[in-house]
Structures are given as structure tokens and as C-alpha cells.
Amino acid sequence: MNQLDYIKKFTNVVIDSGNIKYIKKYSPKDVTTNPSLILRESKSKHYYPLLMDAISYAKKKGGNLNSYIINANDKLLVNIGREILKIIDGRISIEIDVRLSFSYLDLIIRAKKIISLYNSYGIENNRILIKIAATWEGIQAAKFLEKSGINCNLTLIFSLVQAIACAESNVYLISPFVGRVNDWYIKNFKLNKNSKIDPGVKLVYKIFYFYQKYGYKTFVMGASFRNIDQIISIIGCDAITISPDFVNKLNNLKLKKIKNFIRVNLESKIKKNKLLEKEFRWKFNQNFMAVEKLSEGIRLFLRDQKKIDSFFLKKFKSG
């Protein structure tokens, strides 16, 4: 047994990729994607027909240039998702345009539109997770969508207050970003990269213990890892989403059994409180790291989303 097989005994290993070749190779149950991954894979020969189909769809829908770009993007998400769902048994996480991260109503409308497109191809809601940035508006939109039978993956989680708000809203799954949290502390507090204290891992523990203590049903999926030790440190978490590179490394790594699982300690000193909007915003604002990393994460996804938009725009202008 290798390290990957050992981890799979306790934690669902999700592949963070849009690469069909790697997904076929490692056969994960579930897959996550984001604008950066879609941009990377959109340049491949395999995805070119999917891009052209999205363009054709958008042109048929008509409307102004903005409508064309929105429709092309949405259809591309569905096209890629359909291809991936053909080779996995579980779910795919599809990210909503991050420009809607602060618009409650627009997030709901876009999510329902994308789900409707999937449904039109015979794909049920239970195969899709709608990824939304964990802003206050995003969390409230997810709360509404969950009540409507649309499960969500709240991403860019950098603080316990975001996680609590998601759990209170009965969100299906959250994705704490382990590596990016640690990056911030290394940069701002000169934390040694080899330090045994990993703030990103600590955040996942804190969230997981809190959920366990108070019986929340929201799943915790660790994301954004920088090294193997971070991954191994949260074995026992509901899920982890990792790149094909990490999957390959774990697959070739000799077995190292873990003594202290994340599930062992269910103690949490934090009291359960229902968060109102003003309390959420105040507590979140006090966490410099979380504010900075959420903002940065949205900007980075937007950067890559704009590159996809530019591709569609060129195709539109060229006829």
C-alpha cells in the first residue's frame, strides 16, 4: 500500500484539475475546477471543440456582447463538466464567475442557469457542486440554493467565521485554503517554511473540531496545498482536493502511517453563535490575513476569467 491508498482509507481524495488524461489515469470519485484550471486546459486540442461549441451556443442565443461572453462562459463550464462526468462517479465542482461574488441575486440566477443547462443534458443536480467565493453575499446565496436543491462548495475559506457562517447556512461543503494561509504567515511574520506550526493546517483542525462538536453536516475539504506534509497532516478530514502532481507524488510515496488523526480531538472552546451580517463582517474584518487572501483569491480568479473572456471576444469579432 502506498501513501495515496492509505489516505483514501480515511479521506476522500478529489482531483483539482480539468485535465481529462489525468482524471482517467487516477479515477477519482470527484473533481474540482476553477477559472485558472479551465484557462490552462482550454488551450488543449481536446477542449477546442468544446470551446467552439460554447461560441456557437452563445451566438445562437444572441443579445449584446456582454450576454455573448456570459453565455459562452456558462456553456463552456457545462461542456467541460459533461466530459469529466462521463469518467467519474461522483461530483464536479464548477465555479461561478467571481465578478458576482458580492451580488446575492446574480449568484442565484447564474447558478440556476448553469444547473438548468446541465439538467437539459440529463445530468442531475446531485452530480454538480456550484463553487462560490465565501463572501457574505456568496454564503447567503448558497443558503438559498441549498434550499432549492442545489448543493454548493464555498471556496476561498480563510477564517473560522466564514466556516461558521457556511455551516449555519447549511452549505454542503467548504474549501479552506491551507497553503495560501501559510503563505501569508511566511510572508508577513517570517514564518519558517519548515516550521512545525502550520497556520493553514491549524485552521482546518479548528473548523473540523467546531463542526464535529456542534454536529454541523457541512463537509470540510482541504485545498491549496504547498507540500505533502500539509496533506498528510489533515488525514481524517472529510476530503482533500489536490493537483495531479500531488496525486502522483503520493502514489509513489512509501506508506507512512499516521498516529494522530484529525478526528481524534473533538474539543473546541469556541461557542456556537448564530452570525448576523453585521457580526460576520466585523469579525471577518478583524482577520487581516483572511481579508487580504479572500480579496487576492477573487482577483486571481478574475485575472484568468478575463483571459477566457478575451478568447471568446476575439472569436466573436473574427466571425
UniProtKB/Swiss-Prot annotation:
Identify the keywords attached in UniProt to this record, alphabetized.
Cytoplasm, Pentose shunt, Schiff base, Transferase
**According to the UniProt entry, what is the EC number of this protein?**
2.2.1.2
Q: In which pathway does it act?
A: Carbohydrate degradation; pentose phosphate pathway; D-glyceraldehyde 3-phosphate and beta-D-fructose 6-phosphate from D-ribose 5-phosphate and D-xylulose 5-phosphate (non-oxidative stage): step 2/3
Q: What class of enzyme is it?
A: transferase
A cellular component term, taken from the record's GO annotations: cytosol
UniProt-listed PROSITE patterns: TRANSALDOLASE_1, TRANSALDOLASE_2
Please name the catalytic residues of this protein: K131
- Identify the InterPro entries for this entry: Aldolase_TIM (IPR013785), TAL/FSA (IPR001585), Transaldolase_1 (IPR004730), Transaldolase_AS (IPR018225)
Q: Where in the cell is it found?
A: Cytoplasm
Q: Catalytic activity, per the record?
A: D-sedoheptulose 7-phosphate + D-glyceraldehyde 3-phosphate = D-erythrose 4-phosphate + beta-D-fructose 6-phosphate
Which GO BP terms, alphabetically?
carbohydrate metabolic process; pentose-phosphate shunt
Annotated SUPFAM superfamilies? Aldolase
Q: Which GO terms describe its molecular function?
A: transaldolase activity
Subunit details for this protein? Homodimer.
Spell out the family assignment given in the record's similarity comment. Belongs to the transaldolase family. Type 1 subfamily.
- Please describe what this protein does: Transaldolase is important for the balance of metabolites in the pentose-phosphate pathway.
Would you tell me the protein name for this molecule?
Transaldolase
**Originating species:** Wigglesworthia glossinidia brevipalpis
The gene is tal
